[in-house]
Amino acid sequence: MAHLVWQDDLNTGIQVIDNQHKRIVEMINLLHDAQQGKEHAAIAEVIEELVDYTLSHFAFEETLMEDAGYQFSRAHKKIHELFIRRVSEYRVRFQAGEDVGDELKGLLSRWLFNHIRNDDAGYVDAVRHSMSELVKDKSEGGWLSRSMKRFFG
């Protein structure tokens, strides 16, 4: 498997999410590179970093969806949980000495691109709207500032 290449159709238009997705792609490519060196410790380090980063990305993404009131946030979170379970199984197999690198890279790349194009695309409008409301709210002085003006002139 060659290095993954970011494609424009993967952009959600939410810069912070796109940057996180790109970082995950970079990490999958690092896994590929570590595998070429055949150093177990280097591969283990990349797998751990990739899993940790993905978990934090999921938590961030889920918070954005919940804050935006996205109606399918619970279902989306379930998808994340199932994926985490699958990747955790690969981690255990790797720690037991099994060579799961190619299999794991294939799963990660297929799942990530499919997930971004299909599942993540569903929340984009709600999150973008929520984020624009936050920016608007901040530019208008925020909730407290508006309330103070309304009550005290």
Swiss-Prot record:
Keywords: Iron, Metal-binding, Oxygen transport, Transport
List of residues binding Fe cation 1: H21, H57, E61, D120
Keyword set includes Iron: yes
Gene3D superfamilies, A to Z: Hemerythrin-like
Pfam name, any one: Hemerythrin
Tagged with keyword Metal-binding: yes
A GO MF label: oxygen carrier activity
Residues at which Fe cation 2 binds: E61, H76, H80, H115, D120
Domain of life (superkingdom): Bacteria
Job of this protein: Oxygen-binding protein. May be involved in a storage mechanism or for delivery to oxygen-requiring enzymes. The oxygen-binding site contains two iron atoms.
Subunit comment: Monomer.
Similarity-based family: Belongs to the hemerythrin family.
HAMAP family: Hemerythrin
Protein name as catalogued: Bacteriohemerythrin
Source species: Pseudomonas paraeruginosa (strain DSM 24068 / PA7)
